[in-house]
């Protein structure tokens, strides 16, 4: 849908990814074992302030940092007080602006505030894909002839910079 094409970034929970898809031909079994939950794709608008709130919440959890799409970068310092840990939050190299509205994609578990990520429930212009699951999106990505290279996977987009 055009709604997905206009998405600026995507966020998912670490616990929603349960395996790695091995190199080579991608099988349906590999996709299902990696993304086993029936989470639908959801798009919504969030302000930069709401995005920062989500990232702060993740930085306060022992294993709950959100996994982010290409172009989004977050650095946080786990030695700082909760709520003040995010030190860098950029999209395509530009700082996330509190007042700017960003069109994001996530899964239905997070969209409903799962894992305590409450700011997702404040999202505007919400659109649930109605039976179109995260696993469907992964399959469609590969069916369209897209690949994932080692180069694309290099570098941490989310990193703890604690000294």
PLM regions with names:
Residues 3-163:
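Feature captures C-terminal
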């Amino acid at each position: 849908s055009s709604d997905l094409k206009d998405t600026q970034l995507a966020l998912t929970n670490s616990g929603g990814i349960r395996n790695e898809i091995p190199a080579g031909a991608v099988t349906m079994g590999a996709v299902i074992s990696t993304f086993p939950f029936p989470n639908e794709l959801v798009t919504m608008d969030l302000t930069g302030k709401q995005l920062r709130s989500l990232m702060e919440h993740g930085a306060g959890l022992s294993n709950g940092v959100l996994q982010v799409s290409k172009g989004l970068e977050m650095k946080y310092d786990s030695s700082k007080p909760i709520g003040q840990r995010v030190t860098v939050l950029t999209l395509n190299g530009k700082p996330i602006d509190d007042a700017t509205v960003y069109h994001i994609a996530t899964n239905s578990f997070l969209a409903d505030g799962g894992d305590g990520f409450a700011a997702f429930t404040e999202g505007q212009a919400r659109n649930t894909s109605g039976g179109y699951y995260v696993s469907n999106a992964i399959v469609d990505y590969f069916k369209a002839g897209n690949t994932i290279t080692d180069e694309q996977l290099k570098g941490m987009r989310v990193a703890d910079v604690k000294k």
